[in-house]
């Protein structure tokens, strides 16, 4: 349930049970993973809650990720690419970056954290191929976010916060007129 929140509040257990039972009763005709069920549950819950915006995190990668079924996002984010999930995503940083870059859609915008040179080249090539705009997280963006209270520990979380803030500013910037603290 901590994976699904609306306005900072976790989905109630009753809704997890109700939506989980609803989804388990459907014959999708394919084998779904736990991530697939959680994604479907989140989408149903967000629809019920009439969310204006959703932040959806991919599972392992990008290219073959279940989240691609949602369609073209207003903005995608690629965080720092490392060597995790090498058995699934690839044996070197360029292969892993190619998988992660699979979330870049035609004529879209993607916020990208600072990357290894090889990873960034792959991301830039994919963005160019898809006519996508890249917004790069800079040190000044990270510094601006350093005063935020984050729920997770680790210095890399400041980079993630900066990427999330840039994505929010991009998406909301077109329509947003509320107070600055709401973006934070």
Which residues does each PLM region occupy?
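Short intrinsically disordered, low-complexity coil segments enriched in acidic
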Residues: 1-8, 150-153, 184
């Amino acid at each position: 349930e901590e994976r699904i929140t609306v306005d900072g509040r976790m989905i109630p257990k009753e809704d997890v049970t109700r939506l989980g039972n609803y989804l388990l009763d459907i014959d999708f005709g394919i084998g779904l993973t736990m991530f697939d069920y959680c994604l479907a549950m989140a989408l149903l819950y967000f629809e019920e809650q009439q969310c204006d915006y959703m932040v959806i995190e991919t599972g392992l990668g990008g290219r073959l990720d279940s989240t691609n079924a949602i369609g073209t996002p207003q903005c995608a984010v690629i965080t720092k690419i490392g060597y995790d999930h090498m058995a699934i995503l690839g044996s070197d940083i360029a292969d892993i970056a190619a998988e992660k870059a699979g979330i870049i859609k035609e004529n879209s915008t993607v916020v990208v954290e600072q990357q290894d040179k090889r990873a960034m080249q792959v991301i830039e090539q994919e963005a160019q191929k898809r006519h996508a705009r890249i917004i790069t997280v800079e040190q000044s963006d990270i510094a601006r976010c350093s005063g935020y209270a984050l729920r997770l520990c680790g210095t890399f979380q400041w980079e993630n916060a900066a990427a999330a803030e840039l994505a929010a500013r991009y998406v909301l910037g077109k329509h947003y007129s509320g107070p600055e603290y709401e973006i934070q």
